[in-house]
Amino acid sequence: MYGLRTLFSLGLLVGGARLGARVAQVGALGGTCPLGQGLVADGNSQCKQFRTGAAMERGLRYLSQEEAQAVDEELFNEYRFSVDQLMELAGLSCAVAITKAYPVSSFTSNLPTVLVVCGPGNNGGDGLVCARHLKLFKGYEPAIHYPKRPNKTLFENLTTQCQKMDIPFVSEFPSEPEVIDGAYNLVVDAVFGFSFKGAVREPFGNILSTLKRVTVPIASVDIPSGWDVEKGNPEGIQPDMLISLTAPKQSAVHFTGRYHFLGGRFVPKALEKKYSLNLPPYPGTECVQKLP
């Protein structure tokens, strides 16, 4: 995704012999890697080095599912962020990142259309916010497919906001990838986030199957839908762009697309320090940062 690669352990260089000892130790402990080590447990219960170039040289932390949930819980409970507040910041970050990777001038068709596919949870809410901001940005024409709408005020409000801004909702998802390729310049995958577990149920199974076969680029919000949060999914969709929110998740090491952005400039410094997130500095007033 993203020479010699440098491995840091809490900011200290780990030599080859010490690394070998650590790998053996972690394997004996069942494959969970120490926090802040720049390591991730693979399917063989061993740790492997993150291969993310300069990002990991700065010690950027990649989170497991449990760690990502813990960070979110602290944002909600300790720092008193609301769900809709974080959703707004996340969705805005996604829209801004898309404009940087896919400016309207790069679209091949005359109509700069973007299909935003939203799931039933918070990731889908991020997608609704993203679509609304894309509509406000000059030139983008988003459309939304939202097959499973939660019966909750937050999501009803987000849906109404998009409708009031004349963003069309696509009732039927095209089963043929050629239809999507011909109608849209970009697909935003906002189906499942890092909290998703278990088998993919319909209609999302067919949706992801179709997205695996499209040729237009896909931008995934936080996690490529259908991926294991920590192990990825080589048989799943392979997005051209990944927008990691708060901090990258461990599955991001398997991302091979062209654009990896970090979004959501809302993490308090004390929380960043507690979890050794080592987030890269955001330039100026930007809410996104491109990762190597």
From Swiss-Prot:
Keywords: Isomerase, Metal-binding, Mitochondrion, NAD, NADP, Nucleotide-binding, Potassium, Secreted, Transit peptide. Residues 1-52 form a transit peptide. K(+) binds at residues 123, 189, 225. It comes from the Eukaryota. Binds 1 potassium ion per subunit. Pfam families: YjeF_N (PF03853). Its EC number is 5.1.99.6. GO terms for molecular function: metal ion binding; NAD(P)HX epimerase activity; nucleotide binding. The keyword Transit peptide applies. SUPFAM superfamilies: YjeF N-terminal domain-like (SSF64153). InterPro entries: YjeF_N_dom, YjeF_N_dom_sf, YJEFN_prot_NAXE-like. It is found in: Mitochondrion; Secreted. Residues 68-279 form the YjeF N-terminal domain. Its cofactor is K(+). (6S)-NADPHX binds at residues 122-126, 193-199, 222. GO terms for cellular component: extracellular region; mitochondrion. Signal peptide: none annotated. It is an enzyme of class 5 (isomerase). Catalyzes the epimerization of the S- and R-forms of NAD(P)HX, a damaged form of NAD(P)H that is a result of enzymatic or heat-dependent hydration. This is a prerequisite for the S-specific NAD(P)H-hydrate dehydratase to allow the repair of both epimers of NAD(P)HX. Belongs to the NnrE/AIBP family. HAMAP family: NADHX_epimerase. This is NAD(P)H-hydrate epimerase. It comes from Xenopus tropicalis. The gene is naxe.
